[in-house]
Curated annotation (Swiss-Prot):
GO cellular component term of the entry, any: cytosol
HAMAP family documented for this protein: KdsB
Native source species: Rhodospirillum rubrum (strain ATCC 11170 / ATH 1.1.1 / DSM 467 / LMG 4362 / NCIMB 8255 / S1)
Protein's pathway: Nucleotide-sugar biosynthesis; CMP-3-deoxy-D-manno-octulosonate biosynthesis; CMP-3-deoxy-D-manno-octulosonate from 3-deoxy-D-manno-octulosonate and CTP: step 1/1; Bacterial outer membrane biogenesis; lipopolysaccharide biosynthesis
Localization: Cytoplasm
Listed InterPro entries: Cytidylyl_trans, KdsB, Nucleotide-diphossugar_trans
Transmembrane stretches, start-end: none
Name recorded for this polypeptide: 3-deoxy-manno-octulosonate cytidylyltransferase
SUPFAM superfamilies given in the database record: Nucleotide-diphospho-sugar transferases (SSF53448)
GO molecular function terms noted in the UniProt entry: 3-deoxy-manno-octulosonate cytidylyltransferase activity
Predominant location category: cytoplasm
Keyword flag Endoplasmic reticulum: no
Described purpose of this protein according to its UniProt entry: Activates KDO (a required 8-carbon sugar) for incorporation into bacterial lipopolysaccharide in Gram-negative bacteria.
């Protein structure tokens, strides 16, 4: 893609945190998808966005080796870090100690069918206004069962007719807001200003974050503006063996 001046100046970097420990699908990053480890499939999708370097933040050496064998960049991180955000931050600080990359995109390592355009959208959104600290993505819920499913995180964003982005006011596993109108499925892909990410990981978990078990609430509890961009697709997250089969079919 041809980068705008503001995008080029921000020098975005995409970081994909990955670790072998997974309750429902152990060894998930190295799960085979048509002869390619899943983490490499995710790395390829991120490279296709064309916004800057893509770095895998690996908790274990076997993940880093798989990425490097495919021609990618990987940084080995502390396996005992408390969250993916901490892993992303440690990897960026080790890879780019000079601070050249001013925007950091956190892409989950279990999205092998990710549309690269979603990464571009997140970066464009965080750069849209100077007081946006980080951006994320939302998609309107159309399946009724998702509204009440606590595993589908809802974003509270007051979008007027025709608006394609807005300030996120809250995130919850509950069906919010009440009353007639759309509900939005939160997609856990983030573009941070680098200073925001550094501040975020230095803060303790908040009361609401611990209650909802949603890390992004730490940002809201500390008055960071999260801008949510509306997109029309939710990427498939691979959490189970059944999800893995779906991903293989989609990439077949």
């Amino acid at each position: 893609m041809t980068q705008s001046p503001s995008l080029a100046a921000a020098a975005p970097i995409v970081v994909i945190p990955a670790r072998m420990a997974s309750t429902r699908l152990p060894g998930k990053p190295l799960a085979d998808i048509h002869g390619v480890p899943m983490i490499v499939q995710v790395w390829r999708r991120a490279m296709e966005a064309g916004i800057g370097p893509v770095l895998v933040a690996a908790a274990e050496d076997e993940i880093a080796q798989a990425v490097r064998a495919a021609g990618g960049n990987a940084v080995l991180t502390d396996p005992d870090l408390p969250s993916g955000s901490d892993r992303v931050w440690q990897a960026v600080e080790r890879f780019d100690p000079a601070g050249r990359h001013a925007v950091v995109v956190n892409v989950q390592g279990d999205l092998p069918t990710l549309d690269p355009g979603l990464i571009i959208r997140a970066v464009e959104t965080v750069l849209a206004e100077p007081d946006i600290a980080l951006s994320t993505l939302i998609c309107e819920i159309t399946r009724e069962e998702e509204r009440t499913n606590p595993n589908v995180v809802k974003a509270v964003v007051g979008l007027a007719e025709g608006q394609t982005r807005g300030r996120a006011l809250y995130f919850s596993r509950a069906t919010v807001p009440h009353g007639p109108g759309p509900h939005y499925h939160h997609i856990g892909l983030y573009a941070y200003r680098r200073t925001t990410l550094g501040a975020f990981v230095s803060l303790p978990p908040g009361v609401l974050e611990r209650r909802e078990k949603l890390e992004q609430l730490r940002a809201l509890e500390n008055h960071m503006r999260i801008e949510a961009a509306l997109v029309d697709t939710v990427p498939l997250g691979v959490d189970t063996a059944e999800d893995l089969e779906r991903a293989r079919a989609l990439l077949g």
